[in-house]
Amino acid sequence: MLSFRIPRHTFPRLLQYALAVTPLFLAAAIVNTQSPPADSSSHSSSTAPPCIAFTFDDLPAHGPLPAGETRAEIATKILAALRDARVPPTYGFVNGATLESEPQDLPVLQAWRAAGNPLGSHTWSHMNLDQNSLEDFEANVTRNEPLLSKMMDNEDWHWFRFPYLAEGYAPAKHDGIRTFLAQHGYKIAGVTMSFADYLWNDSYGRCKAKGDNAAIAQLQSSYLAAADANIGFYRRLSHALYDRDIPYVLLMHIGAFDAEMLPRLLDLYRSRGFQFITLPEAERDPFYRNDIDPHLSSNPNTLEAAMAHRKLPLPPQPVPPAPLDTLCR
């Protein structure tokens, strides 16, 4: 990362590339990074626990649907885990186009709202800004609005998450979409913690279909290990930059394996000292000011980009230890 303008989607794509071409390296890539750097002296880190807002993309459906399960059942598992862990209202980001081909999945959105959780926009069809014109992307965002307005009634649905975290690599497109979002009252849902949870859902579907419980146990272990390692990775970046923990926003997906693992994942974050907060609470922090008001410059819009801007060395990001693409094939 050599420039100041670094699109958010760079890191998931690099992670997928590494996963595909270096499976032997990946097995040794996760390191114990759960503690902040030793030279951190911020009083805030010693007096206040780290906070995190969970968010879920791709509602109402993400990834393969294992045999015998429904999308509504996946959502029910996720909602139950959030409720049992006393997680405050949690934004789910919607692709309305899914309901055209799978109208039976509308209960997912209804259950999300009935549980007191808000919805935001993920575009109508999960459109990639970098692969489409600005005009087509804007129309795709607008097309999602009637569904969100209906589902949210008088509550705030003007939160937007870029599909693929692609915010427009070309400066004109990048600036153009931020102007559009600002003019239409949107706030951008940032991402300051992720462990590429979506990578496990395909493998889980295959392994469950084969009844390979040993492989599923491997997936469970590597999923939690990746989450734990990335807790340390992002906390180190925050402490290197600001000598404190910013309130983190975690990117998740409404996948079958995510639903299976969410109770244990929430336990992991709590065991690491995290308190759960809402997305609006997290983005009150000054770090997110350019996402709350997209009229402002978006740089830096991630912890990685902030590190690059400050010319601070970026440690290797942990990546999953298992060859997920080939498991249970």
Where on the chain are the PLM-derived regions?
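Active-site beta->alpha N-cap acidic-glycine motif
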Residues: S42-L165, L250-L251, L268
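A short acidic, amphipathic alpha-helical/loop segment
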Residues: P107-V108, G176-I177, R264-L265
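Alpha-helical scaffold elements lining the catalytic groove of polysaccharide deacetylases
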Residues: P66-A67, S101, M127-M151, A170-H184, ...
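Signal peptide processing junction and immediate N-terminal pro/mature segment
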Residues: A28-S41
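Short, basic, helix/turn surface patches
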Residues: P118-S121, L147-M152, D212-G232, P300-L327
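C-terminal domain-boundary segment and adjacent tail
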Residues: D84-R86, E100, G190, R244, ...
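Bacterial N-terminal signal peptides
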Residues: Y17-A29
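N-terminal secretory signal peptides that target proteins for export/translocation
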Residues: M1-P12
